[in-house]
Amino acid sequence: MTEQQILDKVQSIVSEQLGVERSQISPNASFTHDLGADSLDNVELVMAMEEEFDLEIPDSAAEQITTIQQAVDYILQHKKSLSQNNLSQNN
């Protein structure tokens, strides 16, 4: 999955969860300051991303993810780590 594909999915999740037009969701948009998310919204966003990308985001990491791009970077890094682990286990 490419960074652009992850960005598209994250933007879709945020748009759906927060009721914000996708055109308003830039990579640097802050969930709270720019998109109006509260703490419950943030929890729901993390849960939706965990489900969509089949990964677990620990609370400590979730607290550090405050923008769309940070979410994309975390997911991209986590997916790379999983892929590398799967490759090494299969060899």
Swiss-Prot record:
InterPro entries linked to this entry: ACP (IPR003231), ACP-like_sf (IPR036736), PP-bd_ACP (IPR009081)
Processing after translation: 4'-phosphopantetheine is transferred from CoA to a specific serine of apo-ACP by AcpS. This modification is essential for activity because fatty acids are bound in thioester linkage to the sulfhydryl of the prosthetic group.
Species this protein is from: Cyanidioschyzon merolae (strain NIES-3377 / 10D) (Unicellular red alga)
Domain Carrier: 4-79
Residues modified as O-(pantetheine 4'-phosphoryl)serine: 39
A Pfam short name: PP-binding
Protein name: Acyl carrier protein
GO cellular component entries: chloroplast; cytosol; membrane
Function noted in UniProt: Carrier of the growing fatty acid chain in fatty acid biosynthesis.
GO molecular function terms attached to this record: acyl binding; acyl carrier activity
Family: Belongs to the acyl carrier protein (ACP) family.
Keyword terms, alphabetized: Chloroplast, Fatty acid biosynthesis, Fatty acid metabolism, Lipid biosynthesis, Lipid metabolism, Phosphopantetheine, Phosphoprotein, Plastid
UniProt-annotated location(s): Plastid, Chloroplast
Predominant cellular place of this UniProt entry's protein: plastid
Involved pathway(s): Lipid metabolism; fatty acid biosynthesis
Any one GO biological process: lipid A biosynthetic process
